């Protein structure tokens, strides 16, 4: 069986090599690149992201990343956003009172978490969506690794999307599965066996 090809999009943000290694461990053939043709033709595209929403969007625009993601989604070709790579799929992010437009695939804003300790850093359980492909077969007490200060805290998109939630004082979206577009707020590449299972399920679905 031929390995599925995955591009980890290199736009200056994210744990590129750790994502590459994690995907390779679940059987994917992985390239880290900003090349448009490679990103468009791969079976799957991973959009990582760490740091500020605005900085990630600026980096994405430099390599026409918005267009790459949009054209893949329009063609039904799978895209997986991770951490800030999930956040930038929403309409906007609000940091320090400044609103930055996102890719706009999902309506709504990514806003700061309200909790005594920020960032939310460490392991947490999730309430996975019924029928989820990403979390299929995982125990309800499976834990995932989060490092973030901002999140999408409500869903205004398609009612058919599969939504997985986590709680850090208040609920926030931990993962979304919406046709060809999927995303996780946690880092699957840092989440041990549970994260590997999520990546394996995504690769298997390519």
UniProtKB/Swiss-Prot annotation:
GO terms for molecular function: glutaminase activity; imidazoleglycerol-phosphate synthase activity; lyase activity. One of its GO terms (cellular component) is cytoplasm. Residues 5-206 form the Glutamine amidotransferase type-1 domain. Its EC number is 4.3.2.10, 3.5.1.2. Coiled coil: none annotated. It holds the Pfam family GATase. It catalyses: 5-[(5-phospho-1-deoxy-D-ribulos-1-ylimino)methylamino]-1-(5-phospho-beta-D-ribosyl)imidazole-4-carboxamide + L-glutamine = D-erythro-1-(imidazol-4-yl)glycerol 3-phosphate + 5-amino-1-(5-phospho-beta-D-ribosyl)imidazole-4-carboxamide + L-glutamate + H(+); L-glutamine + H2O = L-glutamate + NH4(+). It is found in: Cytoplasm. Signal peptide: none annotated. Keywords: Amino-acid biosynthesis, Cytoplasm, Glutamine amidotransferase, Histidine biosynthesis, Hydrolase, Lyase. The active site is at residues 83, 187, 189. It comes from the Bacteria. Its main location: cytoplasm. One of its GO terms (biological process) is L-histidine biosynthetic process. Pathway: Amino-acid biosynthesis; L-histidine biosynthesis; L-histidine from 5-phospho-alpha-D-ribose 1-diphosphate: step 5/9. Heterodimer of HisH and HisF. IGPS catalyzes the conversion of PRFAR and glutamine to IGP, AICAR and glutamate. The HisH subunit catalyzes the hydrolysis of glutamine to glutamate and ammonia as part of the synthesis of IGP and AICAR. The resulting ammonia molecule is channeled to the active site of HisF. This is Imidazole glycerol phosphate synthase subunit HisH. The lineage of its organism: Bacteria, Bacillati, Actinomycetota, Actinomycetes, Mycobacteriales.
